[in-house]
Amino acid sequence: MVQENKNFATAKAKSIRVSPRKLNLVAAFIRNMKVSEALVQLTFSPKRIAKVVKTCLQSAIANAENNLGLDIDRLVVTKATVGKALVMKRVMPRAKGRATRINKFFSNLYITVTEKEDN
């Protein structure tokens, strides 16, 4: 069996109470960014969901450092993908005895950090 050098670490956050469209705005913002820069940007971001994305990114960094022994200073966010999770359906009463459905969306977030070679 051939041993492959694994130079990436992943972290995931599931069932986050935000729509995938809103979460993808923040995820797309940190893609291909150095992790130190991404943490600074997420800390000062006005988006509510940036706090959850920052927690997931810190988990990926910790996985890279503790499980694989990668250098934190050379880590880059290579993937930040967003997926749809469950949809909570609620009913809102309206006029004349009618009712409308309200969909409350949930999302999944997957972050991959990779150690880049110095050129």
Curated annotation (Swiss-Prot):
One of its GO terms (biological process) is translation. Signal peptide: none annotated. CDD domains: Ribosomal_L22 (cd00336). The keyword Cytoplasm does not apply. Keywords: Ribonucleoprotein, Ribosomal protein, RNA-binding, rRNA-binding. Gene3D superfamilies: Ribosomal protein L22/L17. GO terms for molecular function: rRNA binding; structural constituent of ribosome. Disulfide bonds: none annotated. PROSITE patterns: RIBOSOMAL_L22 (PS00464). The keyword RNA-binding applies. Coiled coil: none annotated. One of its GO terms (cellular component) is cytosolic large ribosomal subunit. Part of the 50S ribosomal subunit. Belongs to the universal ribosomal protein uL22 family. PANTHER family: CHLOROPLAST 50S RIBOSOMAL PROTEIN L22-RELATED (PTHR13501), LARGE RIBOSOMAL SUBUNIT PROTEIN UL22M (PTHR13501:SF8). This protein binds specifically to 23S rRNA; its binding is stimulated by other ribosomal proteins, e.g. L4, L17, and L20. It is important during the early stages of 50S assembly. It makes multiple contacts with different domains of the 23S rRNA in the assembled 50S subunit and ribosome. This is Large ribosomal subunit protein uL22. It comes from Rickettsia canadensis (strain McKiel).
